[in-house]
Amino acid sequence: MRLLNSQQASFEQELTELLAFETVNDPALLATVDDIIAQVRQGGDEVVLKLTQQFDNHPAKTFAELEISQEKLKQAFDGLNPTIKQALELAAQRVTSFHERQRQESWTYQDALGNTLGQQVTPLDKVGIYVPGGLASYPSSVLMNALPAKVAGVGQIIMVVPAPHGELNPLVLAAAYLAGVDKVFTIGGAQAVAALAYGTNTIPQVDKITGPGNKYVAAAKRAVFGQVGIDMIAGPSEVLVYAEGVTNDKADWLAMDLLSQAEHDTVAQAIFVTPSEPLLKKVAQEIEKALVDLPKADIAKAAIANRGALILVKDRAEGIEVINRIAPEHLELSVDDPEAMVKDVRHAGAIFMGRYTPEAIGDYCAGPNHVLPTSGTARFSSPLGVYDFQKKSSIIYCSEQGSQMLAKTADILAVEENLDAHARSARYRVK
């Protein structure tokens, strides 16, 4: 795990190198994805089935076998262990409760001329959600993508989830049932994204695609953007943990919080920032100790070797500068006064405040969404939310008096822009 010191002359260059990561712009990858999209547009269901057999080793002989019925979703939910079912239901309730507070409403007002102006908020008609699949899959991703869409009032939710060798975690199906997903197809990769974006005989064409996936999924989402909306181009998972080395800091807690992201992927990023050199050394030691019996130690070791870092800063102010420069997906402020510190944090996907708020709680059941901007995009992006599944139309309703007054202004400006038909259209309203 590399060590960076903000007081060293090389710090800026080292930090830039640490944050440099891009997989979606690989020319070979993009060419492969473009070819898959073209095949799906041309061949529809038949091509999607063929590619699913090829890439996922799925045993399906017909496309119909790739769709999971509502009956099977209900069976998966009803068959859950009671403890797991209760946990899933609690998570769903909390996610729903949080996102209900995000719902935007239509509004209007009347100006002095009697014109009615406003904004009409409507849900999207159809959305596609991509859920990573296989036996080691993520029911939490189902809840985090589907429930905000449900709260927004989306008409139809179509879920795609890869099932390598035809195997799928029943908990994912149970989560789909609980979240009210309308259709589920066991397909994945760029072919699933293409099918959602352009539609096939069986898969409805959607208006927007959300959810994380591998580099092929990310590249495909970028490629179809414009044909459909997308939530974001998701990169590898990230966490930045900040602590200051006071008596209450538990180095083993901090180390495990870092590893909770490192175990996701060999290119996940775990960064620890502190002004305390003794704490930095303790955390480094605790990481090594924790790796001894961590089931996914090989993945975590590779992640911290590839993209992990321990960063020593001069003080809190400098720590905040580093945080805002990195704009992490997940930020933990493990300090006594996180309320004071958070005011200066401008860029982070989700902020976990205090020592008793591990990122893992946010992944599952705190309530806020765990689909977050990565790769520094928290500088201009937000977590997935209800607002991603709603759109706005401007409302303009002129009174006769208001139209005559505003038409004069429109006429003048249209003439200056040399748009004569615009000017005449406005002029016709003036008595």
Show which residues each predicted segment covers.
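N-terminal Rossmann-like NAD(P)+-binding subdomain of aldehyde/semialdehyde dehydrogenases
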Residues: M1-D125
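Short acidic-hydrophobic, aromatic-tinged amphipathic segments that line or gate anion-handling sites
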Residues: R2-A9, K183-G188, L310-D315
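Flexible, glycine/charged-enriched surface loops at secondary-structure junctions
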Residues: Q104-Y109, G229, A268-V273, D293-I304, ...
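Conserved small-residue-rich beta-alpha loop and adjacent elements
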Residues: Y109-A174
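Conserved NAD(P)+-binding/catalytic subdomain of aldehyde/semialdehyde dehydrogenases
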Residues: G180-Q269
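Short loop-to-beta-strand entry elements in the cores of soluble alpha/beta enzymes
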Residues: P212, M232-A243, Q261-A284, A300-I311, ...
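C-terminal core of ALDH-fold dehydrogenases
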Residues: R325-K431
